[in-house]
Amino acid sequence: MAIRKFKPYTPGTRQRVVTDFSEITGSKPERSLIVSKHRNKGRNNRGVITCRHRGGGHKRQYRLVDFRRDKKNINAKVAAIHYDPHRNARLALLFYEDGEKRYIIAPAGIKVGQNVISGEGVPIEEGNAMPLSSMPLGSNVHCVELYAGRGAQMVRSAGASAQLMAKEGEYVALKLPSTEVRLVRKECYATLGEVGNSEIRNTSLGKAGRRRWLGRRPQVRGSVMNPCDHPHGGGEGKAPIGRAGPVTPWGKAALGLKTRKKNKPSNKLVVRRRRRISKRSRGGRDS
């Protein structure tokens, strides 16, 4: 997989950088594995906006992805690599020996015709799913379960991987992409290797319209609003916000405020917190 740059024929193509989609082999999704999904456009059940800057975009159908990998000790062949409009990672279509078809998150380097399997005692190969206790130290893994049998909940985005750092008692230590070191029970399943399509981080949309196609609406800076609309608003010209630090439209501290509860039971499983990104390197926008 590689990235594709465009010549500056138009303002939209001047900054545009996209993936070349060379790894995708299937043009149409598996009919039995797609369902319609209601798009709430950032609204809750009462129609009130709870997540701003959402709405519009191209119509999508949801692909049913197997995050549990619960077909144990049954060989599956990779039939195709498909595009998924709901995530940056690609999907691998598996044909199992018993005739069942399933989608999984495509690991980096997986090829059509390759065999994968899940279960205890399976070969240590990329794409195979097994308990964390069966993996050698230093392994890169993705699609990690937090609770055994619940399905993968961590390390699922394109190019992501966690590293198996240590095994001690009933737990193993994983270094997550955020650099946080967390304990996970050893019977939880994970998939060997990293998620494919890592070059997505080097892409650029190039124009506002492509962002609208993805269902993202414009973000208006609070400093250009009126005082009745945002705490940063008002003043003459480009006035400062008049506060010690930036706040949300509802007056709560933004950019750096910890949102994790101090008394959360799973805090004891976090060995080392993720590194804190400075405001300068974060490059965040005015809320």
Swiss-Prot record:
Cite a single GO BP annotation: translation
Please give the Pfam families that the UniProt record associates with this protein.
Answer: Ribosomal_L2, Ribosomal_L2_C
Give the record's GO CC terms. large ribosomal subunit
What are the protein's UniProt keywords?
Ribonucleoprotein, Ribosomal protein, RNA-binding, rRNA-binding
Q: Where is this region: Disordered?
A: 221-287
Cite the record's Basic residues compositional bias ranges: 258-287
The GO molecular function terms of this record are:
rRNA binding; structural constituent of ribosome; transferase activity
**InterPro entries named among the record's database cross-references:** NA-bd_OB-fold, Rib_uL2_dom2, Ribosomal_uL2, Ribosomal_uL2_bac/org-type, Ribosomal_uL2_C, Ribosomal_uL2_CS, Ribosomal_uL2_dom3, Ribosomal_uL2_RNA-bd_dom
Coiled coil feature spans: none
Top-level taxon of the source organism: Bacteria
Matching entries from SMART domains are given as: Ribosomal_L2, Ribosomal_L2_C
Its job: One of the primary rRNA binding proteins. Required for association of the 30S and 50S subunits to form the 70S ribosome, for tRNA binding and peptide bond formation. It has been suggested to have peptidyltransferase activity; this is somewhat controversial. Makes several contacts with the 16S rRNA in the 70S ribosome.
Q: What does the annotation say about its assembly with partners?
A: Part of the 50S ribosomal subunit. Forms a bridge to the 30S subunit in the 70S ribosome.
Describe the family membership recorded for this protein in Swiss-Prot or TrEMBL: Belongs to the universal ribosomal protein uL2 family.
Official protein name in the record: Large ribosomal subunit protein uL2
Supply the source organism's classification. Bacteria, Bacillati, Cyanobacteriota, Cyanophyceae, Synechococcales
